[in-house]
Each structure stands twice: as structure tokens, then as C-alpha cells.
Amino acid sequence: MIVGIGVDIVELDRMARSMKQPRFLKRLLTDAEYELSQQYPLPRQIEFVSGRFAAKEAYAKAIGTGIAHGLSWRHIEILPDETGRPVMTAPFVGKIHVSISHSQTYAIAQVILEEEGHHVSS
């Protein structure tokens, strides 16, 4: 059974400006996400970081707390599986579905949370 849905959209230009702040990436990304982001050239890096930001915001909306009350950006990790599909690890007992997409202007993400034992087919 679905217990939460969250969606977020991010302007790539706004994220590019935020990324100029020295500690921004270290606050937003886990160590593994940060290492992966550093492998990309700058235009792709902005898309990557924007997608992660949108997905983490979408998760916070789906869980219902926002980034507060003991939940930080670094509690949520999104890494690609062997096929490149994003896989989210976060404090939730159940299945987390995440989808990330971007254009030249925006990144968007959707997160769906399912109760343990009540999964829809992926």
C-alpha cells in the first residue's frame, strides 16, 4: 500500500549558483554521492546534483516531515544500480521508488513510499 508520495522540481541555474558555495555539496550529498558527482564534467554535475536535491526533497515530502525533525540531506542517499537506475536508501521501513529526470532547465523527481509487504510491481 502506498503511504507517501512526493514530487519536487529544481531550476538548474539556481542549483549552479548554490553549488558555488564551498560547503553546499558536502551538506547535501553523502560521501558516495559526492565522489560520484566529481566524476562528471560541470554541466552534467549540475544535472546530477539537481536531481539528487529534487529526489531528497521529494522523499522529505513523501515521509511528511520535510528536512527537519532529525532528518538531514545526508540521511538520504541515491546511487545508481548496475543498470544506472537510481536507488534511494533512507530511513524508511518499506519500498522506496524514485524517478529522476532533467531537461536543460529543470530537474524533477518523484518518490513513492510503500509499506513493507505491500509492493506494487516495478
Swiss-Prot record:
Q: Which reaction does it catalyse?
A: apo-[ACP] + CoA = holo-[ACP] + adenosine 3',5'-bisphosphate + H(+)
Q: Which residues bind Mg(2+)?
A: D8, E57
| Keyword presence, Lipid biosynthesis | yes
GO CC terms: cytoplasm
The protein's organism comes out as Exiguobacterium sp. (strain ATCC BAA-1283 / AT1b)
Supply the name of the protein.
Holo-[acyl-carrier-protein] synthase
Give the EC number.
Answer: 2.7.8.7
User: Which Gene Ontology molecular-function terms are recorded?
Assistant: holo-[acyl-carrier-protein] synthase activity; magnesium ion binding
Q: Which UniProt keywords apply?
A: Cytoplasm, Fatty acid biosynthesis, Fatty acid metabolism, Lipid biosynthesis, Lipid metabolism, Magnesium, Metal-binding, Transferase
Q: Which GO terms describe its biological process?
A: fatty acid biosynthetic process
Give the source's domain of life in one word: Bacteria
The opening ranks of the lineage are:
Bacteria, Bacillati, Bacillota, Bacilli, Bacillales
Q: Where in the cell is it found?
A: Cytoplasm
Q: Pfam families in the record, alphabetically?
A: ACPS
> Function, please?
Transfers the 4'-phosphopantetheine moiety from coenzyme A to a Ser of acyl-carrier-protein.
Task: Give the family this protein belongs to, as stated in its UniProt record.
Answer: Belongs to the P-Pant transferase superfamily. AcpS family.
